[in-house]
Amino acid sequence: MEVQCQTSFCQNEDGFPKLLRTCTVRLGIRSQPDYDGREFVDHGTEKCVVTVYIGSSPHHVEWSVTAARHRFKDTCQVVARKALRTLCQIYEEE
């Protein structure tokens, strides 16, 4: 099984990655969301697992979220949306 690894800030991706970056900046998170993905073939099916790492802010520690789909570009959208949902829960009271 061949595994291809990819790390990206997804800076040029529209949609949820762009919205996630905008939200993290407004919440005082200085580091960019960092996407770490692995594409591989499992039993003849293309799969991709991406983890997005969100840096710490003045009031919260760093955290991460993982999602799985089929391609890196699509999985970045899914994991960014999942991170936005988590971000809303963490910062709900602020």
Annotated model-derived regions:
Residues M1-E62, R69-Q77, R81-E94:
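N-terminal segment of the canonical double-stranded RNA-binding domain
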